[in-house]
């Protein structure tokens, strides 16, 4: 996985955690939901890149 892709996914996770926390503090369910969605997107991105890494290792 490229370092850039991993950094983007990690950034998205941090952004999601911050947004979810803001939603918890303000009581805004939309912020909470969007924050959780960003975290889920980050997990999917990491998973896809991990699969790419594993395939590349097997090919090499």
Swiss-Prot record:
<comment type="similarity">
    <text>Belongs to the UPF0337 (CsbD) family.</text>
</comment>
<dbReference type="InterPro" id="IPR008462">
    <property type="entry name" value="CsbD"/>
</dbReference>
<feature type="compositionally biased region" description="Basic and acidic residues">
    <location>
        <begin position="29"/>
        <end position="60"/>
    </location>
</feature>
<dbReference type="Pfam" id="PF05532">
    <property type="entry name" value="CsbD"/>
</dbReference>
<feature type="compositionally biased region" description="Basic and acidic residues">
    <location>
        <begin position="1"/>
        <end position="18"/>
    </location>
</feature>
<dbReference type="InterPro" id="IPR036629">
    <property type="entry name" value="YjbJ_sf"/>
</dbReference>
<protein>
    <recommendedName>
        <fullName>UPF0337 protein asr1134</fullName>
    </recommendedName>
</protein>
<feature type="region of interest" description="Disordered">
    <location>
        <begin position="1"/>
        <end position="60"/>
    </location>
</feature>
């Amino acid at each position: 996985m490229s370092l850039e892709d991993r950094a983007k996914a990690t950034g998205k996770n941090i952004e999601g955690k911050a947004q979810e926390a803001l939603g918890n503090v303000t009581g805004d369910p939309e912020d909470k939901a969007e924050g959780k969605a960003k975290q889920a997107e980050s997990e999917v991105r990491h998973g896809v890149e991990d699969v790419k890494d594993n395939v590349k290792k097997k090919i090499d």
